[in-house]
């Protein structure tokens, strides 16, 4: 029945720890400017004392920050403490395998959920929800290593809980592909979305400029490939043929790497690759590590009937995938022009009819795949040696299989949002279960890049400050486009959340972004924490010595320059055109500004006094001072370099040294027949005793775990 996914599981847990590290550190470096008492959206507004008991407060807003006052901390300091503890714990889990424990991942998940509850608009991104859901699954997937009385190399039910990660990946990718068509966006239906995407995404990379120069026919073909990878290929996640699953894995990795190269999407794409590790198996991971196991007789000829049928089905799947792509996107090579033509060959009505027809069958496909994993795990439990350990394994299987089925059932509600008719056919009890856990972000709906914005030019808000209303100076951000001569930044896995919200603000009227008035107000006040969100380097902020008296915001349209536009002067990455005023000229005390602040409850109130002699606030302040001189993305890169260097040095230390064989053993002695027989009997006896103590493996498990334990005892 196959091996439990021990190595893929460890890779998933390590990758998730790396994503948590990016999330905690990135947010920590932005807390004062975003959520501090002098920040844009002070977090204390969310947690208002109302006279309720602690449990009632936790029920309404589940966050550990309610406990802050008992530690002498306000809401901002509580957020900093959670981020620091989360960063330390995630770094430990990344570097040390024994720390990848279900209890530690439960703590990380509670920490991030606590931050999410007060994060307001700056934490309302799909990757934050994805991290919370993946973090909850990690609690089920990770072993309990707190007790060392039994080996935790693998558990018979590991493949059951790990299947939920695959199901999450399927929901993420399939929904992301489907919503592009259900949104009726003309660019996605016309296959021209990528001709706009590279220059209109929030924070492009320098590689995006070069990708934007690619010919239109290639951009359209890239959209077709995106549809195939996001809609068709995810169906292979549940195929019984492992080579099809590996093909699906590498397709997903290719797509995510290309997105990473051309856009700054923080930890999102890396986290998606981490989820894709659920498609791997022990054999393939062993080949990655140079420890592949040879299957005797695997190269025998002629092949067995099962192997032949498997290969035939695999080839048929590839052929069907190719036919589906050519037929439904009218792929045709124009030999005279030397290009590949493509267009959508189906209508919106036909697509919605197809989606309605396949949504519930896809649920059935997922249920069948999960049922197979559950039965396979039960078989492995039956193969465990020793009555007590067999009973213990079966009890664990029952608990985790029930939890997995429950998670699968709850996830059907957000998954079927892609077709509301199918959503209405779900059992009412499933909707009730989902409503009960919805505020805990256990499962979520997904669907990225639903509509392509910026058609006709990328809208961009440019802030300008002045002392006299006559001469205006632009305020340039660290990351988002502004100066047309400045190259696009590379900041991932850091997410500059203010820059992202500036991108959303430019898509509508400023009244749709209430935080913007507070942002302008803080700049007029010269609040250092908010200024650091714009520029860490004071020399690059034009009003570092004295705050501006007046501020206004202009709306521009930005476009990437073309390669033919490069001249003899300084290279320009962008060209822009003024559109209109985005935010009127205001100053401190301006009635317009005060009215906007009062309308959204953002007017300054007398904050609570902080204790000055408490140890914990002093410690948090000291740590904050250490991070101030550095840019956030540099801090994150440095932490990852430290982690990578540590892992590399550890791997080099574990690698066996080459060179001449040791001289103390002249030659391996050949045991006499009777002595060799006694040694063999002794080894078999030790193996049986180990299995009876719980060290035993299922009969269907791979060889290789037991001998390691024997070597340690020797």
From Swiss-Prot:
Highest taxon listed in the record's lineage: Eukaryota
Residue numbers spanned by region Disordered: 654-714
InterPro entries for this protein: LMF
Biased segments, Basic residues type: 654-669
Positions annotated as glycosylated: 483
GO cellular component term of the entry, any: endoplasmic reticulum membrane
Subcellular location: Endoplasmic reticulum membrane
Signal peptide: none
Record field: compositional bias (Basic and acidic residues): 683-708
The keyword Amino-acid biosynthesis is assigned to this record: no
Main location: endoplasmic reticulum
Membrane topology of this protein: Multi-pass membrane protein
Bilayer-crossing regions: 11-31, 79-99, 103-125, 159-179, 221-241, 257-277, 304-324, 358-378, 398-418, 629-649
Annotated GO biological process: protein maturation
Keywords recorded for this protein, A-Z: Endoplasmic reticulum, Glycoprotein, Membrane, Transmembrane, Transmembrane helix
UniProt function note: Involved in the maturation of specific proteins in the endoplasmic reticulum. May be required for maturation and transport of active lipoprotein lipase (LPL) through the secretory pathway.
UniProt cross-references to PANTHER family, sorted A to Z: LIPASE MATURATION FACTOR (PTHR14463), LIPASE MATURATION FACTOR 2 (PTHR14463:SF5)
UniProt record similarity statement: Belongs to the lipase maturation factor family.
Listed name of the protein: Lipase maturation factor 2
Organism of provenance: Gallus gallus
């Amino acid at each position: 029945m196959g091996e439990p996914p021990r190595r893929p599981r460890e890779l998933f847990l390590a990758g998730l720890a790396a994503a948590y590290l990016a999330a905690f550190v990135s947010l920590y470096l932005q807390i004062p400017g975003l959520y501090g008492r002098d920040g844009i959206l002070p977090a204390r507004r969310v947690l208002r004392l109302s006279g309720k008991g602690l449990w009632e407060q936790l029920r309404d807003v589940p966050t550990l920050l309610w406990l802050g006052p008992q530690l002498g901390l306000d809401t901002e300091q509580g957020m900093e403490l959670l981020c620091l503890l989360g960063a330390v714990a995630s770094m430990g889990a990344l570097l040390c395998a024994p720390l990848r424990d279900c209890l530690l991942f439960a703590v990380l998940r509670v920490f991030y959920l606590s931050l999410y509850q007060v994060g307001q608009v700056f934490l309302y991104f799909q990757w934050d929800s994805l991290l919370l859901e993946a973090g909850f699954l990690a609690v089920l997937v990770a072993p309990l290593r707190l007790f060392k009385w039994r080996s935790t190399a693998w558990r018979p039910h590991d493949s059951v809980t790990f299947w939920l990660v695959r199901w999450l990946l399927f929901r993420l990718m399939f929904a992301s592909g489907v919503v592009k068509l259900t949104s009726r966006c003309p660019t996605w239906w016309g296959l021209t979305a990528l001709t706009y995407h590279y220059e209109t995404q929030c924070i492009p990379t320098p590689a995006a400029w070069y990708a934007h120069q690619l010919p239109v026919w290639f951009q359209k073909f890239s959209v077709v490939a995106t549809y195939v990878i996001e809609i068709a290929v995810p169906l292979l996640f549940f195929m019984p043929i492992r080579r099809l699953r590996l093909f699906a894995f590498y397709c997903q990795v290719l797509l995510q790497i290309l997105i990473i190269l051309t856009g700054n999407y923080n930890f999102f794409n890396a986290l998606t690759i981490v989820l894709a590790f659920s498609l791997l198996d022990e054999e393939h991971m062993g080949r990655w590590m140079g420890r592949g196991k040879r299957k005797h007789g695997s190269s025998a000829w002629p092949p067995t009937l099962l192997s032949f049928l498997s290969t035939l089905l695999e080839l048929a799947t590839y052929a069907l995938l190719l036919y589906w792509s050519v037929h439904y996107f009218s792929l045709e090579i124009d030999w005279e022009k030397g290009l590949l033509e493509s267009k959508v060959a189906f209508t919106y009505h036909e697509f919605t009819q197809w989606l309605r027809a396949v949504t519930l069958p896809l649920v059935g496909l997922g249920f069948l795949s999960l049922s197979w994993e559950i039965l396979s795990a039960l078989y492995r439990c039956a193969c465990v040696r020793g009555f007590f350990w067999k009973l213990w394994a079966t009890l664990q299987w029952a608990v985790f299989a029930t939890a997995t089925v429950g998670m699968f059932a709850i996830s059907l509600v957000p998954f079927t949002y892609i077709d509301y008719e199918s959503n209405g056919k779900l059992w009412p009890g499933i909707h009730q279960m989902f409503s009960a856990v919805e505020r805990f972000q256990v499962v979520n709906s997904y669907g990225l890049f639903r509509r392509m914005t910026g058609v006709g030019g990328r809208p961009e808000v440019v802030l300008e400050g002045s002392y006299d209303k006559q001469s205006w100076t632009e305020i340039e951000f660290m990351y988002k486009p502004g100066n047309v001569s400045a190259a696009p930044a590379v900041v991932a896995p850091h997410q500059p959340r203010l820059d992202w919200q500036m991108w959303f603000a430019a898509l509508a009227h400023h009244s749709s972004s209430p935080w913007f008035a507070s942002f302008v107000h803080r700049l007029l006040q010269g609040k250092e924490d908010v200024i650091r969100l714009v520029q860490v380097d004071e020399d690059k902020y034009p009003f570092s010595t004295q705050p501006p008296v007046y501020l206004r915001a202009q709306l521009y349209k930005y476009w990437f320059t073309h390669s033919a536009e490069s001249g003899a002067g300084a290279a320009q990455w962008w060209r822009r055109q003024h559109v209109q005023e985005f935010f009127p000229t205001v100053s401190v005390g301006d009635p317009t500004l005060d009215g906007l602040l009062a309308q959204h409850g953002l007017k300054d109130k007398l904050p609570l006094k902080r204790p000055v002699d408490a140890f914990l606030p002093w410690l948090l302040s000291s740590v904050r001072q250490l991070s101030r001189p550095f840019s956030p993305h540099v801090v994150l890169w440095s932490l990852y370099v430290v982690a990578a260097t540590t892992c590399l040095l550890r791997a080099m230390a574990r690698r066996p040294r080459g060179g001449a064989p040791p001289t103390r053993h002249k030659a391996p002695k050949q045991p006499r027949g009777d002595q060799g027989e006694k040694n063999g009997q002794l080894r078999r006896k030790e193996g049986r005793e180990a299995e009876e103590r719980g060290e035993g493996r299922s009969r269907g498990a791979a060889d290789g775990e037991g001998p390691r334990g024997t070597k340690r005892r020797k």
